[in-house]
Amino acid sequence: TSHDEYAGYTEDGVKNAEMLSRLLKKFQTASSLVPAPVFNQEKNTSSMGIIYFGSTDCSMQEALDMLQEQNLKIDAMRIRAFPFNLEVWEFIEDHDLLFIVEQNRDGQMRTLIMAEGGIIPDKLVSILCFDGQPITAEHITNKINAHLSGKPTPAIAAS
């Protein structure tokens, strides 16, 4: 069941398809109107990138400084809205490996990126924190360094 363009009840499959197509068009339009992501660099110069959002911002800035002190250059982008606009997809396309920093257990942003963009899972590495505490710069840098050294650590809590 569905509704028609006047919000009236309908079981007409053609009307349902029309309404879903209409919603898809709105969703595509919205992606050009939402706030653009914020980049930590003027131009992407690394094959690696970090995607983060929300309350991870302050810790992420500190982590980027720590990584730079280790001579590890990683481009970074803070997502501010969904649906993702073109700049998000361009950033993803420009990088061979992306770390997705999240404060949840399930890697929801990583899953959303894969589902919406058809991105292969191997390109996206989750950096998760879900111990009830704010994520720290040390946790982020430790997880990135562990992954790059070939010794990834379990994604349980902040370390």
PLM features: what roles do these ranges have?
Residues 1-159:
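Flexible, low-complexity linker and terminal segments
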